[in-house]
Design a protein with these regions (language model features):
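Alpha-helical linker/hinge and terminal dimerization helices associated
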Residues: 89-111
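Short helix-boundary/capping micro-motifs
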Residues: 35-42
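Basic, amphipathic "hinge/linker" alpha-helix immediately C-terminal to the N-terminal HTH DNA-binding motif
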Residues: 70-95
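Short, Lys/Arg-enriched N-terminal segment that forms or immediately precedes the first helix
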Residues: 4-17
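Residue cluster at the C-terminal edge of the helix-turn-helix DNA-binding motif
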Residues: 61-66
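Central "turn" residue of the DNA-binding helix-turn-helix
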Residues: 46-47
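Residues within the DNA-recognition helix of helix-turn-helix
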Residues: 55
Length: 115
């Protein structure tokens, strides 16, 4: 029997002190970075502002690093941006995910196409 047409699926996340960095927090931080606002990022992702801040605060507390810096509104408007630590974590997680994707793809070819 020839085993073809299969695709390997997986989920990857990082865990430290009970807080998880996976697709959800990755998407949130990426949106904050791109939009400059926790409020806009949370709306874009279909979550409440409170839920977004909750995810950020739990991770910050458990990991002992700041993730987001904010400035309250006013005439010039408020903003939010990632800390250097959060930016590095986000970029490193994306690289890890890309390399694992390639690895899993290669294994799938090896085991399910016979190449």
């Amino acid at each position: 029997m020839k085993l073809t047409g299969f695709k390997a699926e997986y989920k990857i996340w990082l865990e430290k002190n009970g807080a998880i960095f996976g697709d959800g927090l990755c998407d949130l931080l990426s949106s904050i970075s791109g939009l400059g606002s926790i409020s806009r990022a949370s709306r874009e992702l279909g979550m409440s502002y409170r839920a977004a801040w909750g995810k950020i605060r739990v991770a910050e507390k458990k990991w002992g690093i700041p993730l987001v810096v904010t400035r309250v509104g006013g005439a010039a408007g408020g903003w939010a941006k990632l800390t250097p630590e959060a930016d590095e974590l986000l970029k490193t997680y994306c690289r890890l995910q890309q390399e694992v994707d390639e690895f899993v793809q290669n294994l799938t070819v090896k085991f399910f196409t016979g190449r």
